[in-house]
Amino acid sequence: MAEAYLLEKLKSVEQTFHELTRRLGDPEVATNPTEFQEVAKARASLEETVNTFEDWKATQQELADAQQMAKDGDEDPELKEMAAMEAAELTEKLDGLETKLKVLLLPRDPNDEKNIMLEIRAGAGGDEASIWAGDLVRIYSKYAESQKWRVKLLSESGGEMGGFKEAILEIQGERVYSKLKYEAGVHRVQRVPATEASGRVHTSTATVAVMPEVDDVEIEIDPKDIEMSTARSGGAGGQNVNKVETAVDLVHKPTGIRIFCTEERSQLQNKERAMQILRAKLYEMELQEQQASVTSMRRSQVGTGARSEKIRTYNYKDNRATDHRLNQNFPLEKVLVGDIELILETCIAQDQQAQLADLAAAV
């Protein structure tokens, strides 16, 4: 690895990892569950980097030995040829490990570990846009289930012909934001709607916002800025239906954000949910403002994450989902059943390559 600064950084990571390992064996840490969990989590976040660095060092030594054997004129020609072939394989392996190490050393998005609120809003296209928003809810729900994540519908406003005018999902699990953050933006569908008698293709849109969950410490909300009213919840069965005002209609006066929450069983639970959604929305606004203010720095080549950015078109006639940031097509039938892993992995890879290019240019 030619870059000396990367070697120094890797040695520093290795040193920190060994120090954290030592602390896990410290009786004072072991008897403090909170501290033990924090240390264990910090150590786990470095483990892949340290293991890859160890593999790189071992491979580098193996390569040096193979190259020496290939150069040794006293050895058997057949043995020299085998050594040369091994050296070529080890060189390829070493290049792969170096690329992986560079990716592992990239700055991490502090939100990547967080759960999310995923908001889907029907855009242009009337009833068909609401139906499309409902399709997106199913796509993300199925993808989340395939990842063993937990999904819950927090808030909804149904469309007249089905689907949703607006829906908010809570998705919890391992590194949810790190993947689904790439889904923020405008999703356009081109198809013949079920409501279209003449068979004409319509274009409709829905907007996806991906909001990391935040607690009340990260986002403070002045109670005076909240205007709240209650309403009776509709629903199936139960003595409380249409008798007790459990639904909460919450307005944040400074921003005009309005949240209507009916999914929980009690008014208190719905209020807590509404505040949780509000914090996530305010935090997302902060993130958007921060990104908009960074004009001289690189913007992600897989998109800005802005709600107005058109990121993908779903064409039913051609059975094709086109990601405009990647300039690639993907099979629509897979996407519609929640199989979007390849798209997300490609987004992540392109984002990492862009960051690596910036890193190389800055050195």
UniProtKB/Swiss-Prot annotation:
Disulfide bonds: none annotated. Methylated by PrmC. Methylation increases the termination efficiency of RF1. InterPro entries: PCRF, Pep_chain_release_fac_I, Pep_chain_release_fac_I_sf, Prokaryotic/Mito_RF, RF-1. The modification N5-methylglutamine is found at residue 239. Pfam families: PCRF, RF-1. Keywords: Cytoplasm, Methylation, Protein biosynthesis. Its main location: cytoplasm. The keyword Disulfide bond does not apply. The keyword Cytoplasm applies. One of its GO terms (cellular component) is cytoplasm. GO terms for molecular function: translation release factor activity, codon specific. SUPFAM superfamilies: Release factor. Coiled coil: none annotated. It comes from the Bacteria. It is found in: Cytoplasm. Belongs to the prokaryotic/mitochondrial release factor family. NCBIfam families: prfA, PRK00591.1. Peptide chain release factor 1 directs the termination of translation in response to the peptide chain termination codons UAG and UAA. This is Peptide chain release factor 1. It comes from Acaryochloris marina (strain MBIC 11017). The lineage of its organism: Bacteria, Bacillati, Cyanobacteriota, Cyanophyceae, Acaryochloridales. The gene is prfA.
